[in-house]
């Protein structure tokens, strides 16, 4: 049930992303689907970034010709639902939790961290935001402003340029204040940057080795406009730390968003927000 709700919410979230899916189902409503229609459907599915493998699966279902238009649409929906059958809603439980937000430059990490803080604060959690992007002063200032708007605590060590040290201080502070949830905003980094990826690995080691009382959740921000390149990024980040979920950003500026399917199909990373 959650998977179906999640798929519908993403398809219906924004008009740009919804349009191609609606066009596909409109074509599928025809009594007879021509070879030209199949080519059009294939083109529209590829444009949503659903991926060539999944597009080919859907085209195969259409070519089988075993269903009338209504059953065909339902079977395609069921096929997509089945692909995400292991998809689970992100659960922040009662014990202390730290969410580490990672991703490439400009993918929306800082805004995502702020939105998560608002979401969980509204749900009754005591939240601390930690600014571990020590390279970009604007990110620190932005997160500080968001923390004031949300009404949660904000941690940044202006005397340290070491992100892992900032995270250490943030978690120690959260323990002292008995906060439920720590959200860490990390610096944007290309998955090809070896030194920055090692830095991310160090952050994870600090959390896992020094703060085992915290449940660690790693979320990767995915810029919906980047398409299939997001799969490459997520795969490389996953080599540093296991990704528990993805946050799909910038859907308002693209007709894409179908990347959620190959993201889970290939890497088993669910889109949680």
Language-model segments: which ranges?
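Short, Lys/Arg-enriched N-terminal segments with co-localized hydrophobic residues
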Residues: 1-5
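Generic, low-specificity signal for short hydrophobic/alpha-helical stretches with a mild N-terminal bias
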Residues: 7, 37-40, 185, 219, ...
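Surface-exposed, interaction-prone regions with an acidic/low-complexity signature
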Residues: 8-14, 241
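Primarily NTPase-proximal linker/entry elements flanking Walker-type ATP/GTP-binding cores
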Residues: 12, 16-134, 139-175, 179-184
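Conserved Walker B
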Residues: 134-135, 187, 225, 251
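Conserved catalytic-core segment of NTP-binding enzymes
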Residues: 163-176, 192-273
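Short, flexible active-site loops
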Residues: 184-190
């Amino acid at each position: 049930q959650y998977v179906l709700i999640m798929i519908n919410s993403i398809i219906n979230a924004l008009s740009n992303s919804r349009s191609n899916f609606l066009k596909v189902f409109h074509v599928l409503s025809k009594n007879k689907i021509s070879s030209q229609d199949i080519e059009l459907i294939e083109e529209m599915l590829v444009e949503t970034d659903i991926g060539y493998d999944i597009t080919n699966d859907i085209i195969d279902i259409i070519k089988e010709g075993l269903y009338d238009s209504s059953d065909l649409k339902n079977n395609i929906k069921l096929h997509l639902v089945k692909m995400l059958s292991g998809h689970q809603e992100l659960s922040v439980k009662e014990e202390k939790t730290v969410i580490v937000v990672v991703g490439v430059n400009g993918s929306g990490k800082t805004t995502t961290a702020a939105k998560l803080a608002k979401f969980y604060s509204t749900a009754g959690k005591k939240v601390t935001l930690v600014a571990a992007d020590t390279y970009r002063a604007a990110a620190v200032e932005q997160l500080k402003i968001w923390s004031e708007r949300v009404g949660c605590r904000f941690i940044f060590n202006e005397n340290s340029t070491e992100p892992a040290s900032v995270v250490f201080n943030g978690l120690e502070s959260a323990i002292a204040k008995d906060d439920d949830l720590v959200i860490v905003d990390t610096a944007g980094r290309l998955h090809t940057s070896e030194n920055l990826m090692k830095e991310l690995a160090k952050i994870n080691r600090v959390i896992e080795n020094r703060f085992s009382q915290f449940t660690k959740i790693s979320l990767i921000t995915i810029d919906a406009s980047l398409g299939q390149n997001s799969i490459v990024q997520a795969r490389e980040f996953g080599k540093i730390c296991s990704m528990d979920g993805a946050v799909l950003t910038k859907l308002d500026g693209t007709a894409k968003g179908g990347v959620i399917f190959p993201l889970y199909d290939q890497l088993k990373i669910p889109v949680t927000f």
